[in-house]
Amino acid sequence: MIPYLGPLDLFPPVEMAREDMGGLLAVGGDLQPDRLLDAYRRGIFPWGTVEGQPLWYSPNPRMVLFPEEFRLTRSLKKTLRSGKFEVRFDSNFRGVMANCASTPRPGQDGTWISPEMKHAYTRLHELGWAHSVETYEEGVMVGGLYGLAIGHMFYGESMFSHRTDASKVAFAHLVDYLVNNQFGMIDCQMYTDHLASLGGREIPRDAFQARLSALTASGSPRTVWSTDPLDPAR
């Protein structure tokens, strides 16, 4: 039986997540900033809804990427050095979410990024917790990603690309920023071949939870991020 959360109910222990249901832990609650931040600090994230109620997950194993293990391929390094794309941080958070929601994905019918999700994460962005990285070509946004930063932990949520390597360029700049600001881990949530190609790997949930506690200990919002002047292709 999956627990149902009322407005004041706390999350159950992550060990109660149903591995036969992809790590589903609970249903219900709300998407207010305090609940979302509490969820992420506990290693829990919302993914989709049923009858308007959020679904909360804590999968085992957990897909992560350690910034120092980011795989910068020769072709991506060439793209970065070409100067084809301009990269900005926190310049169009709403636009990134809208593109992530509307971009078709193989094997996915529709999107889990509902209007309620957009509102919730936009509010976290306004509070300084959620951030975006955008890739532009001739002034038009063609790729990007968004996620949350708590302490020295980054939680990746979604990315999109309308040009070859556009989202990878954004990700490379994100990793460079995280390395230079002593972030220890990127939560990628669930396995995909794309994330694995960038250096992501699965680790046991208990190992993820142990690292999470230390990395989120100094969890204050970082306000607006500025574009990293360093070159991730160096």
From Swiss-Prot:
UniProt keyword terms in alphabetical order: Acyltransferase, Cytoplasm, Transferase
Gene3D superfamilies xref list: Leucyl/phenylalanyl-tRNA-protein transferase, C-terminal domain (3.40.630.70), Leucyl/phenylalanyl-tRNA-protein transferase, N-terminal domain (3.30.70.3550)
InterPro entries for this protein: Acyl_CoA_acyltransferase, Leu/Phe-tRNA_Trfase, Leu/Phe-tRNA_Trfase_C, Leu/Phe-tRNA_Trfase_N
Reactions mediated catalytically: N-terminal L-lysyl-[protein] + L-leucyl-tRNA(Leu) = N-terminal L-leucyl-L-lysyl-[protein] + tRNA(Leu) + H(+); N-terminal L-arginyl-[protein] + L-leucyl-tRNA(Leu) = N-terminal L-leucyl-L-arginyl-[protein] + tRNA(Leu) + H(+); L-phenylalanyl-tRNA(Phe) + an N-terminal L-alpha-aminoacyl-[protein] = an N-terminal L-phenylalanyl-L-alpha-aminoacyl-[protein] + tRNA(Phe)
Calcium in keyword set: no
EC number: 2.3.2.6
Molecular function GO labels: leucyl-tRNA--protein transferase activity
BP GO annotations: protein catabolic process
KW Chaperone (keyword) present: no
Cellular compartment(s): Cytoplasm
Main EC class the enzyme belongs to: transferase
PANTHER family: LEUCYL/PHENYLALANYL-TRNA--PROTEIN TRANSFERASE, LEUCYL_PHENYLALANYL-TRNA--PROTEIN TRANSFERASE
Function (record text): Functions in the N-end rule pathway of protein degradation where it conjugates Leu, Phe and, less efficiently, Met from aminoacyl-tRNAs to the N-termini of proteins containing an N-terminal arginine or lysine.
Name used for this protein in its record: Leucyl/phenylalanyl-tRNA--protein transferase
Organism: Dechloromonas aromatica (strain RCB)
